[in-house]
């Protein structure tokens, strides 16, 4: 599909062909909405999990430019290999795109076979991934807390990304799932990215939450920062039953502290706020921190007497290969991708894969999850 990139075409022709090829293959043969630049942009996410840097995207762009104008095939193959890996990691049709490129450039299967492989594999995988995204499940977690009086049940929602591919009907689905639980819920937390992009989300989107009678605590994520945050928060506080915890602490039922920290890039500032809030209350109750971005290296958090950290943002790695990292290397890597982690027997970190995504509503072998957390106390 991208073999034309290896030729010395004029820039305008490359752009025209890129648009044409990706329009045909992405919109015509598949049922997801991806573009070349989206994949390049998302490529940084995988490496960002480990290095917290976007330099890897720059490397990919450099490789692409060199491959366009160099006669040495090693650069072409490096770019194609890089592109295949990135595409496979980050979009459901990425595997199909990568397979097509690999066949066309390296294996050189006949074009008609490539086309059939792409149609069957790409469309089939797309259907599976869209189905997965539209059928969220509960991820049940059970933990113990000796300092807690009685038991607690918490529902953890994250990364709804309303306003893009998700609307009121998505909220209705999540709310109905919660209401149909055969257990009493003490409170719900939403750990950021309630909205997606700069599309306005109105009160109507959030109205189904009013059916939930227990408290719903909410903090912002990085996508609220990208949009009309001030107006959205004002609407949340005035017209919905969501309780915004903007860098605040509430004592729930005189049994546990809930610390809400809105999204911030500066970890030092976040640490300072956590320490200030805990010291200010100083009631010796267990502390639950709700925060959007996972604490990638829990060692960076001093001993704040935390019991549990709830977060999202990573979408479970978004697709299948990343989930293997957790199972095979999760105890050696400090990176938190999905699920429950125990940090040095001091506190728990639960990273929920969430129910939405930014962009096409699809997930590659990573379930859309709502956290259901049972805490057993004394």
Where do the language-model regions lie?
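N-terminal signal-anchor transmembrane helix
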Residues: 75-81, 103-181, 200-201
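Non-catalytic terminal accessory segments
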Residues: 1-136
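Soluble catalytic domains of enzymes that build or remodel membrane lipids, polysaccharides, and related
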Residues: 147-378
